[in-house]
Amino acid sequence: MTINSIYPATWLQLFAYDPQSQPPNYTGSERLTPEMKTYYDMTLLDEAQPNLVHDQFGQKRPIPQGSGKTIEFRKFAALVKALTPLTEGVTPDGGELTVTAITATVSQFGYFIVQTDVLELTAIDNTIVEATKLLGRQAGLTLDTITRNVIQASTNVSYAPKVSGGTETEVTHRYDLDESAQLTVDLVQQMVTKLRAANAPTINGDYVAIIHPYVAYDLMRDPEWQNAHQYTTSENIYAGEIGKLYGCRFVQSTEALILKGDPLTAAAENLTVKTEASSGTTLAVKEAISAEEAAALAGRKIYVGSKQYTIASASSGSANAATLTLEETIAETITANTVVYPGEGGKNNLAVFSTLFLAKDAYGVTEIEGGGLQTIVKQKGSAGTADPLDQRSSVGWKAIKTAKILIPDYLLRVESCSSRYSKTAKAN
């Protein structure tokens, strides 16, 4: 059964159920009352919405009805300056509004839980309610990740500089980021300046940054930091908002992107160079690599010595018999016993955190209301011969979702490490 309507939480009092109003042969397993439909749907949305941190700043569009799988976002071009003086009594030529349509294809996502307990329809069953809450959180995190992964593809990326003895060293690649390369107040000011220079519109008067708690830990210790309660009321605070710096409001989320390479084999996160290499494209390693692991290594990035390489292929073998073939020629002396790290993170595979800086209408998302996110409840007895003893019920969610970058200059990201947490954080 699909549930679409959203009603205020105060309607929960309508769950009082009068068995006298039901048909004489009503058993409690034939249908859901409208009030219970409402409750389950509200519960799902209430649990999903706090997790949609990346969605809340996008240009929202309803799910297209009857128009296939394509949704349209709109980008409006700025008007040129009107510098020509008006002539008395003469009507000047007018201009036109330039609108660019940007389309995206929607996809459907969903999940369900099978319940073996009896679904009691004369009262709200706690098991179903708890399942709906868990599903709501899962739906929110799923849809938030879909949006996050789209907008994290922005190519407007800056890397935090490394700092040693008070001297900054520019970083131009993710794999060079170390624990000293942190998000600083100066970097925040640089991002705000870039957005202002692009004439990017603010969101309710400020720009917004989505930041991981581990990165916020470093930034919040700055004396210029303002906690959220110091500049806004609880009614106007964003979901996850923690504070503000130089015209940028920071929203904290554990789903802010963390970049770190997976272990290179099932038994070892890192590999070890067996034989010194200073040319060619082959590295012999000490660890055993299975045929399945060798196939999975093709295309992976690694960090060895002081450079990043891409694995073209790997030859399986027992300990001291496996090799890696690289796409690039080895351009330095790599001595025996040098550690080979996964190369998708920072230096030596430190976790790298991506902080997004956003202006208004930087990207578009589909709404979860109006059919974007639905609760599906199947009571026991609804499966026919597939459930001959009426032993199972289910509750799940289904969503139609897409996201799209609309104006790349309005979306910036900074990749940095955390002084305390980059060694232990995991990719998400």
Please state what every model-predicted region is.
Residues 119-197, 214, 275-278:
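Alpha-helical scaffold segments that mediate packing/assembly in large oligomeric complexes
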Residues 67, 107-123, 127, 192-221:
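Structured, hydrophobic secondary-structure cores that serve as assembly/anchoring elements
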Residues 61-62, 195-200, 238-240, 384:
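A generic local secondary-structure boundary/capping motif
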Residues 77, 117, 399-403:
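Beta-strand elements of well-folded, non-transmembrane domains
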Residues 95-123, 360, 365-366, 370-371:
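Short acidic, glycine/tyrosine-flanked loop/strand segments centered on an H-E-D-like triad
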Residues 16-57, 170-190, 216-316, 321-428:
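Sequence/fold signature of self-assembling virion shell proteins
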Residues 2-105, 411:
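N-terminal "assembly arms/tails" that initiate or stabilize quaternary assembly
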Residues 73, 133, 137, 209, ...:
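Hydrophobic alpha-helical segments involved in membrane association or supramolecular assembly
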